A protein has these predicted regions:
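Nucleotide-state-sensitive switch-loop elements of NTP-binding domains
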Residues: 4, 10-19, 33, 53-129
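Walker A (P-loop) phosphate-binding motif
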Residues: 25-58, 63
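Conserved beta-strand segments of the P-loop GTPase G domain that flank and frequently precede/overlap
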Residues: 38, 89-90, 140-144, 163
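Short glycine-rich anion-binding loops that position phosphate/pyrophosphate groups of nucleotides
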Residues: 41, 122-125, 144-147
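Short, well-ordered beta-strand core segments
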Residues: 86, 117, 138-139, 153, ...
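Conserved Switch II/interswitch segment of TRAFAC-class P-loop GTPases
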Residues: 135-150
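Conserved small/polar residues in nucleotide/adenosyl-binding loops
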Residues: 151-158
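Hydrophobic alpha-helical segments, chiefly the membrane-spanning helices
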Residues: 164-168
Length: 168
């Protein structure tokens, strides 16, 4: 019977992506640009939410949008029609942006003049959630077709009560 030899390299398959994401965060921090990775299923309201947000906050903050899509430019055209500074990133069949694509897009976008940059990721909830893009925050919009997600964090008082022995 043959021997099995295991070689454990202890390196994440995301190691290169994570390194680029860290560089992206450092670059944006230096430029004083806060980047949000906005995710949802198709039709959940990402574009509409971004246009309304830009209209509400545009007088106080310089806002830009990075539109990610497999092949379409529809959302970037909507942003432009609404007067929102944006660029279109075609992911070439990839189901979500990764750190390398984000960095390439940033090289084409004048982020130094922005306070807030929102990446409208590809309409998909499977791929983008686990991929680090270099964004400061990840935000998910859930709509009724996905069902209702309710997360409540217990208050400190409730947590304290749960540590008390039961009287039964």
């Amino acid at each position: 019977m043959g021997n099995v030899r295991v070689i454990d390299v202890h390196q994440s398959v995301y190691a290169v992506n994570d390194e680029i994401a860290a560089k992206t965060r450092a670059r944006l921090k230096e430029e004083k640009t806060f980047m949000v990775n906005l995710m949802s299923s198709p039709g959940a309201g990402k574009t509409t939410t971004l246009i309304r947000t830009a209209n509400m906050l545009g007088d106080r903050y310089r806002i830009g949008v990075m539109e990610a899509d497999i092949d379409s430019s529809v959302d970037a055209e909507k942003m432009a029609a609404a007067g929102v500074t944006s660029i279109q990133v075609h992911t070439g069949g990839e189901c979500a942006m990764d750190a390398h694509m984000t960095m390439q897009a940033l090289d084409e976008f004048d982020t130094e003049g922005l306070d807030l940059l929102v990446m409208e990721n590809v309409g998909n909830l499977v791929c983008p959630a686990e991929t680090d893009t270099g964004a400061s925050r990840n935000v998910v919009i859930l709509s009724y077709p996905e069902g209702c997600l309710l997360y409540t964090s217990p208050s400190p008082r409730d947590r304290q009560k749960s540590r008390m022995p039961s009287s039964a």
